[in-house]
């Protein structure tokens, strides 16, 4: 099937979806209606561009016909040639745009995310770097107009982060931050280092799409829910009423503890959001591991432990190892200006997928 057959198939499906979404039987089925609505929304831009492309093709035909019928009239011929030139230029631009729009879409791109950051190898320095990454993502989220909510955090004795879980909400969050999963390495002189030696530490980042209850059902029988008293610094109980919640997904032993909120229900709701995302992500990773290597993400190996980026403080340098990008502006990037890296990763991914599409 060539690109134009694919585009026509997308338009045909779009029109079919429009009819289905006005069917009372579909409207009454919330789950199906939501799925079809998302499918329609995901193809809307492609269909609009394809229809514009067909209009441009018609303009080219009309201009060529006008030239033939100009009857030697130089004014009409010149006008038709100018229209033809503009239409052909627009045709090339739309062909490039349509190729990009035909690339397989990640169904999670428009979703909010659950962001997890952990200090890994390097002790206190790794925990401090995890805090730097948290601040970087918070500032980037602010620049994008997203909402950033820390849901759970644990700190070490020097103010570094052992682990933090955050919800980032807004437009197309996952599409921009999905490439951040992996090991982030830092090279710098710790404040406690008296001889000026550079130490290397790592923090790990995990980005998971938020999973709505209607998208992924967890059998209540597979969950163990424990209620206990929230504890403060030093381990003392800070609530007379048991408000802290621990949820364990028994088949995978994935567990979430939540005690940030003042009520049991709010802690339970937040814990369910996280465990739903983790369980869905767990099984998505298993499914991905079973796919052929060509079908895995084109950026990196997809291995969560893969070192994806190095932040070198002495050289003010950031290197993304997956695409060979080096920027001498570490201070700028840690201040939340991630756009250059994000754009480069998105472009690289699209380029690889376009090459694959052209080779089919």
From Swiss-Prot:
Main subcellular location: cytoplasm
Family matches, as SUPFAM superfamilies: Release factor (SSF75620)
Location of the region described as Disordered in the Swiss-Prot/TrEMBL record: 288-308
Keywords, sorted A to Z: Cytoplasm, Methylation, Protein biosynthesis
Modified residues (N5-methylglutamine): 236
Chain intervals with Basic and acidic residues compositional bias: 293-308
NCBIfam families xrefs: prfA, PRK00591.1
UniProt-listed Pfam families: PCRF (PF03462), RF-1 (PF00472)
InterPro entries: PCRF (IPR005139), Pep_chain_release_fac_I (IPR000352), Pep_chain_release_fac_I_sf (IPR045853), Prokaryotic/Mito_RF (IPR050057), RF-1 (IPR004373)
Protein name: Peptide chain release factor 1
Annotated organism of origin: Streptococcus equi subsp. equi (strain 4047)
GO molecular function: translation release factor activity, codon specific
Any single GO CC term annotated in Swiss-Prot or TrEMBL for this entry: cytoplasm
Disulfide bonds: none
Function text: Peptide chain release factor 1 directs the termination of translation in response to the peptide chain termination codons UAG and UAA.
PTM remark: Methylated by PrmC. Methylation increases the termination efficiency of RF1.
């Amino acid at each position: 099937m060539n690109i134009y057959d694919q585009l026509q198939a997308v338009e045909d499906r779009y029109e079919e979806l429009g009819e289905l979404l006005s069917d009372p039987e579909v409207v009454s089925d919330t789950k199906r209606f939501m799925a079809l609505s998302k499918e329609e929304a995901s193809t809307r831009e492609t269909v609009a561009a394809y229809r514009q492309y067909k209009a441009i093709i018609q303009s080219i035909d009309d201009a060529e016909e006008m030239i033939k019928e100009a009857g030697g009239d130089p004014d009409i011929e010149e006008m038709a040639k100018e229209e033809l030139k503009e239409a052909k230029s627009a045709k090339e631009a739309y062909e490039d745009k349509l190729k990009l729009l035909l690339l397989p879409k990640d169904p999670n791109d428009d979703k909010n995310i659950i962001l997890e950051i952990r200090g890994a190898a390097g002790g206190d320095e790794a925990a401090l770097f995890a805090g730097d990454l948290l601040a970087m993502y918070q500032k980037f989220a602010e620049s994008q107009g997203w909402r950033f909510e820390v849901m759970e955090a644990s700190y070490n004795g020097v103010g570094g982060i052992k682990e933090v879980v955050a919800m980032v909400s807004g437009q197309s969050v996952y599409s921009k931050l999905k490439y951040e999963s992996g090991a982030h390495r830092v090279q710098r002189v710790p404040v406690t280092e008296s001889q000026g030696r550079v130490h290397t530490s790592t923090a790990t980042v995990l980005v998971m799409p938020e999973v709505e209850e209607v998208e992924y059902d967890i059998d209540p029988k597979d969950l163990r829910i424990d209620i206990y008293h929230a504890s403060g610094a030093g381990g003392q109980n800070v609530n007379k009423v048991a408000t802290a919640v621990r949820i364990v997904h028994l088949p995978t032993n994935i567990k979430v503890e939540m005690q940030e909120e003042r009520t049991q229900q709010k802690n339970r709701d937040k814990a369910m959001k996280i465990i739903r995302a983790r369980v869905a992500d767990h099984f998505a990773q298993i499914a991905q591991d079973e796919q052929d290597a060509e079908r895995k993400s084109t950026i990196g190996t997809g291995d969560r432990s893969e070192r994806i980026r190095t932040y070198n403080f002495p050289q003010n340098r950031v290197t993304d190892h997956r695409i060979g990008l080096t920027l001498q502006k570490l201070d700028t990037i840690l201040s939340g200006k991630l756009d250059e890296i994000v754009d480069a990763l998105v472009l690289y991914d699209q380029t690889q997928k376009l090459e694959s599409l052209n080779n089919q």
